[in-house]
C-alpha cells in the first residue's frame, strides 16, 4: 500500500515542486511513498524557473523535468497527506473537499507540530496497530491532526506560510527556499521515524 503525499502551491512551478522533490528524495528509502504536486492556479505545462532549479540543485535535486498541473478533487481525495505552501492553499483544499481537513497542513505548520509531538510517535504507531512503514506514516498524520490544536502557535500566523518567489528577486527565491527546506526535512524526518517505529 502506497503512502501518498500531495504538495500544493499556487502556480506549481516554484514552491510545491521543490517540496515534492525534497520529500520524495528523503522518503524513498523508507517505504512505498508517492509524492506529487499541483497548483491552485497552475501555470499548466510550465517548468520550474531557473532560480528555483539552482536552489534545488544544491540539495541534489534535478527539477528540470517538472511540468505544472492544476489541482483537482480526485488528487486531494487520493492523498494521505496534503502539504500546502501557505494557509490560502490549505483553505482552498479543504473547501474543495472538507473531508481532507485532517490530512491538510501547511508544510511549516506540520513541521512545527512534528517538533512538538514526535516523542509520542512510537505510542501512536503502536495504538494504530501499524505494522508497515506506510501504516506508520498514516499514524503519524493521525497524531499530528489530533494534536494540532494543542501545539503553541507561532508569534505570527505568517510563519505558517512560505513566501511566493514567482517573478521576484533572487533574494526572495533564496528566502523562500530557506523557509521551505528545513520544514520539508522536518516533515520527512517525522514520517521516517513513524515508518521505522512501525517496522520494528
Residue ranges and their predicted role:
Residues 1-79, 87-102, 189-199:
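Conserved active-site segments centered on acidic
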Amino acid at each position: 500500500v502506497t503512502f501518498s503525499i500531495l504538495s500544493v502551491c499556487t502556480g506549481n512551478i516554484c514552491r510545491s515542486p521543490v517540496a515534492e522533490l525534497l520529500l520524495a528524495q528523503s522518503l524513498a528509502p523508507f517505504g512505498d511513498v508517492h509524492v506529487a504536486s499541483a497548483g491552485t492556479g497552475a501555470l499548466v505545462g510550465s517548468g520550474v524557473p531557473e532560480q528555483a532549479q539552482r536552489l534545488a540543485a544544491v540539495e541534489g535535486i534535478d527539477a528540470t523535468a517538472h511540468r505544472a498541473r492544476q489541482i483537482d478533487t480526485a488528487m486531494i481525495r487520493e492523498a494521505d497527506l496534503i502539504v500546502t505552501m501557505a494557509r490560502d492553499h490549505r483553505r482552498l483544499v479543504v473547501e474543495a473537499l472538507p473531508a481532507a481537513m485532517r490530512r491538510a497542513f501547511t508544510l511549516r505548520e506540520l513541521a512545527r507540530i512534528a517538533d512538538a509531538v514526535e516523542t509520542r510517535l512510537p505510542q501512536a504507531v503502536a495504538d494504530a496497530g501499524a505494522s508497515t512503514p506506510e501504516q506508520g506514516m498514516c499514524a503519524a498524520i493521525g497524531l499530528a491532526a489530533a494534536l494540532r490544536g494543542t501545539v503553541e502557535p507561532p508569534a505570527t500566523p505568517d510563519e505558517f506560510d512560505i513566501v511566493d518567489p514567482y517573478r521576484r528577486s533572487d533574494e526572495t527565491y533564496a528566502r523562500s527556499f530557506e523557509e521551505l527546506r528545513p520544514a520539508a526535512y522536518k516533515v520527512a524526518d517525522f514520517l521516517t521515524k513513524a515508518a521505522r517505529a512501525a517496522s520494528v
